């Protein structure tokens, strides 16, 4: 297995290659994953059950924090990444996040969520996702995994980036580099190796829309500018569809309707129309 070393520009070359594994982590709004480089290709490490993606969902089941599992209860936390560096006021006043208002522990200097009697901070919730990724990687690789490169939204400010670093640290990771998600996508496809010019690369995820303007010359990738919106992504498209289907059918907004709306969206990816409660969509 190839170990990729990432160093700062201008740093002296290391004569000896480290035998320590460095993993890449995509901490996503909807799903997260972890990978290693194997023969110059990214190899995604599968979670228990054989799935590559870990839903970024926090739940409390029988008094224990769980990740990626849901049940019929509404008391689960989705899209953890959207909450990072947000104040209680930010969460209450944001229409997308305000559904969590009843779970907020008010009076705290930093926001905490009370989930089935357990209070947990926002970085601690993110750390639970990192812990599951780490344990699965160590099980698959048969080795301790400490170092990681983590992708973050291009628009993340220092506070949000700091909370990602803190969450990873709580999980036992040493983050050697944060990389903007569109930039990571460009590297993943090796664009800098066979492409020259200035390009706009976008990443439309579950909860964020990011863009980076990249200049690629002679195998070197330079980030010219970045931007994005952390309230524009697949989750928001889902909710717009939920509201539309609710108005069309008279059904109340519920977890069941959200699941059905996602099914409609996915079907429309390969069909021109879908029947929903007798209506053509």
Per-region residue spans from a language model:
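Oxyanion-binding/catalytic loops of NTP- or PPi-dependent enzymes
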Residues: 1-98, 104-109, 114, 118-119, ...
């Amino acid at each position: 297995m190839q170990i990729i070393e990432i160093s700062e520009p201008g740093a002296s070359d290391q004569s000896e290659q480290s035998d320590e594994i460095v993993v890449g982590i995509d901490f996503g709004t909807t799903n997260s994953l972890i990978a290693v480089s194997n023969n110059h290709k990214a190899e995604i490490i599968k979670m228990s059950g054989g799935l590559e993606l870990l839903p970024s969902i926090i739940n409390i089941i029988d008094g224990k924090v769980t990740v990626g599992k849901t049940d019929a209860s509404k008391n689960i936390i989705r899209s953890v990444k959207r909450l990072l560096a947000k104040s209680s006021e930010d969460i209450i006043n944001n229409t997308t996040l305000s559904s969590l208002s009843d779970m907020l522990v008010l009076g705290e200097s930093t926001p905490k969520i009370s989930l089935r009697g357990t209070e947990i901070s926002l970085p601690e919730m993110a750390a639970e996702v990192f812990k599951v990724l780490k344990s699965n990687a160590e099980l698959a690789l048969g080795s301790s995994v400490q170092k990681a490169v983590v992708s973050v939204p291009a628009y993340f400010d220092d506070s949000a980036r700091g909370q990602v670093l803190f969450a990873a640290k709580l999980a036992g990771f040493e983050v050697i580099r944060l990389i903007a998600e569109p930039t990571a996508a460009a590297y993943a496809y090796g664009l800098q190796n066979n492409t020259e010019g200035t390009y706009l690369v976008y990443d439309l995820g579950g909860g964020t829309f990011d863009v980076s303007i990249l200049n690629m010359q002679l195998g070197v990738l330079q980030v010219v500018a970045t931007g994005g919106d952390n309230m524009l992504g697949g989750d928001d498209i889902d909710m717009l569809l939920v509201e539309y289907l609710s108005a069309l059918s008279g059904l109340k907004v519920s977890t069941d309707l959200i699941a059905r709306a996602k099914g409609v969206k996915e079907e429309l990816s390969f069909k021109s129309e879908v029947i929903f409660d007798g209506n053509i969509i």
